[in-house]
A protein has these predicted regions:
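Basic, amphipathic "hinge/linker" alpha-helix immediately C-terminal to the N-terminal HTH DNA-binding motif
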Residues: 62-88, 146, 150-153, 218
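Canonical helix-turn-helix DNA-binding module
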Residues: 32-59
Length: 231
């Protein structure tokens, strides 16, 4: 077990590999070429990094024609990366000098995706509002339970929750946000909510980024339904 921990730690400790993992936290699959650009390494070096991450079970790979697409191997990997981010220095104190870098960090802090669900300030505020209204409740250290009124609320916005899914532990998970240091809603319910917000065009993902923009309609609806202040 100690040896496995040491191997995983060494995989995460390389800046290039860490950059690749962070790029894939949005729950997407990307080809080696894009991940090489993300890590700022040569294609051959990227291939070596990716092979190690696949061997270490941090990434999975799928072949489509001539290309290979890489994604995080599991939600547990995403949780581990998020947990490590919580332990690292806050991005505002990490020595980011350029105005563009600071703008990107600010956008990520405000609203971003985390393996298919909403994170950052927006994700945390939505979660806190759901709790305050009794729509979800803490269920142990790692989960939320969906209340009867919560199930009705989600159905009103178009997120159906089958009775068989309510008791499942992975329906609504608590994910510690690395920028807010508080929990946001993850799991199948968190992913379904984000997907529905996208369908309604309340939130719009920024191309080639984990950053999320909230539309004018989204601002109005999130205030109306959850009293989330977005200006």
């Amino acid at each position: 077990m100690n040896q496995n921990l040491s191997i995983t730690a060494s995989l995460l400790g390389d800046p290039g590999r860490a950059a690749m993992l962070l790029r894939l936290m949005g729950g997407i699959a990307l080809p080696a070429g894009e991940l090489a650009v993300t890590a700022n390494v040569a294609p051959q070096t990227a291939s070596e990094h990716l092979a190690k991450l696949v061997e270490g079970r941090l990434l999975s790979v799928e072949r489509q024609g001539r290309h290979r697409y890489y994604r995080l191997a599991s939600v547990e990997v995403a949780d581990a990366v998020e947990a490590l981010l919580v332990l690292t220095a806050h991005p505002r104190t990490a020595g980011l000098g350029s105005a563009s870098s600071k703008a990107i960090v600010g956008s990520l802090e405000h609203a971003r995706t985390c393996y298919g669900h909403l994170a950052g300030w927006l994700g945390v505020r939505i979660t806190e509002s759901l709790e305050k209204r009794g729509l979800i409740k803490e269920y142990g250290a790692k989960a939320y339970s969906l209340t009867a009124s919560g199930r009705e609320w989600f159905e009103t916005i178009g997120v159906g929750v089958p009775s068989s899914a309510i008791a499942q532990k992975k329906l609504a998970r608590r994910c510690l946000d690395w920028t807010e240091r508080r929990h946001h809603l993850a799991g199948r319910l968190g992913c379904a909510m984000y997907k529905r917000f996208r369908e309604l065009r309340w939130v719009v993902p920024v191309r080639d980024s984990r950053v999320i923009r909230v539309s004018v309609e989204g601002r109005a609806q999130l205030w109306k339904l959850l009293r989330v202040p977005l200006g």
